[in-house]
Amino acid sequence: MRIESDLKLDYSDVLLRPKRSTLGSRKDVSVERTYTFRNSKQSYTGVPIMAANMDGVATFEMADELAGLGLFTCLVKTYSVKELVNFFDDSVDSVRNARREHVAYSMGITEADFNKFLSVMEQTDGGIKYVCVDVANGYTKFFAEYIESLRNQFRDIVIIAGNVVTGDQTQELILKGADIVKVGIGPGSVCTTRIQTGVGYPQLSAVIECADAAHGLGGHIIADGG
């Protein structure tokens, strides 16, 4: 057993120090950003705030509302192939493009999950730009190998993978093919992982450490409740 004794911080442990600004109003602030991703070479322009793939949150309706504001959504996994095809292959060009640029398809790592994804990709003529591979434990060897296999089969899809909380596994997933790594185990207000398993990491320290690891490789992270 190894006990880490150095200080780890959660969001509740810190405050943002105010500084002088040349802006006259908060309305003058633009939070839109452009990112180019390491492995897929794709780019994203929008507000870097994401609705997580939670039941009752990341629905089609929410995705359309957020896309209209330049925000991002990772859809829930529960939609059927037919529903997903209808969503991503809308007949209106502007709607279809907005969904392609601001919505991710979410999936697990079972064979059934992969076959479902293939079916949606085929029926939308490759109309999915982002895929979020979401598991409870991002530290398994199988998960890293799955990301590598997915990258080898889909070179230009933006892969979001998680969740992890340490720099070493962040690096591993990026080197295997992930463009964006989801960071966080247990900090969400309704997440029970820490309570039930005793597994987790103070979120601010996790974000700082994982961001440092990712940026050193030209990768990206997303802070997530997990």
Feature annotation, model-predicted:
Residues M1-H220:
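Active-site entrance/lid segments in N-terminal catalytic domains of soluble metabolic enzymes
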Residues A223-G226:
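Glycine-rich anion/phosphate-binding loop at the beta-strand->alpha-helix junction
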